[in-house]
């Protein structure tokens, strides 16, 4: 059968192409609008939040470790997320009720490595870079 040919087929070709686009995974993801609803950040790259508690998340098999994480409540929409605290000993710089800046953690919308269900990581604590605190370049501001 094939596609229609002729002088008056432009509308038919156009509408057919528009309908078929929705079968493309990338097009559907970009245009369906769930990015704003399902993503806790609401489409943004970073978000600020308040630390609720420190938790240890057990690593998946075959690894055996307790990954240091924190529960964070986002300021912009009140959603609660779990965020990973990178580097050895950086959990000591994070305290409850601190304001932290959270970013995505690698694979967009998916957990990374052996940490189940953790999709975000801590970047700043009390407006100070976590890496600067870790390396000793800056001190934690007095609150």
Swiss-Prot record:
Chief location bin: cytoplasm
Cellular component aspect of the GO annotation: cytosolic small ribosomal subunit; ribosome; rough endoplasmic reticulum
GO molecular function per UniProt: structural constituent of ribosome
Annotated keywords: Cytoplasm, Endoplasmic reticulum, Hydroxylation, Ribonucleoprotein, Ribosomal protein
Lineage: superkingdom: Eukaryota
Locations listed in the record: Cytoplasm, Cytosol; Cytoplasm; Rough endoplasmic reticulum
Any Pfam family matching the protein: Ribosom_S12_S23
Record GO biological process: cytoplasmic translation; translation
Residues where Hydroxyproline is found: 62
Entry-linked Gene3D superfamilies: Nucleic acid-binding proteins (2.40.50.140)
Assembly with partners or alone: Component of the 40S small ribosomal subunit.
PANTHER family: 30S RIBOSOMAL PROTEIN S12 FAMILY MEMBER
Protein family according to the UniProt entry: Belongs to the universal ribosomal protein uS12 family.
Database matches in NCBIfam families: PRK04211.1, uS12_E_A
Protein name: Small ribosomal subunit protein uS12
Organism: Caenorhabditis elegans
Gene: rps-23
